[in-house]
Amino acid sequence: MRRNLASVGVGTGPTPSVGKPRRERRGGCHTAMPYAVFASPQVAGVGHSEQELRNGKMGYATRTYAYADTAMGSAMNETDGFVKVLADPESGNILGCHIIGPHASMLIHEVVVAMKSGAGTVGDIRDAIHIHPALNEVVHRAFSGQFHAHE
């Protein structure tokens, strides 16, 4: 699994506190560690890649949704961007999410929060109400609808 060292450093640095100084370190699991490549288009992701799941011989399900199939993506004339979700077909747990397109580095954070703070399931994002028209609808729609199982 890829790790963004700057994000790891910020995420495990001293814990901020109110009132008195504390130097406790945050640590923990890095499965929900996001990464981003600031190229054109942007690339961002969190969790496992499809290749990692295939190599580990894990069953998984995928769903891909194009930016162009949302109102904002269409208004931006975005024809190439997409979101791909990897999930456990039995539990619905989010195994990974990968985004290629404008603002990918910002859009991925909804998935990071769901994986780290929520139940970590597809339903955490699918069941949340999203603003229309907004670009993050592409993330919502990628988590909604029919997933395709892979063995």
Language-model-detected regions and their locations in the chain:
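Rossmann-like dinucleotide/flavin-binding elements
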Residues: 1-31, 92, 134
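Flexible, glycine-rich terminal cap/loop adjacent to redox cofactors
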Residues: 21, 38-151
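Helix-loop-beta segment of a Rossmann-like dinucleotide-binding subdomain
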Residues: 32-37
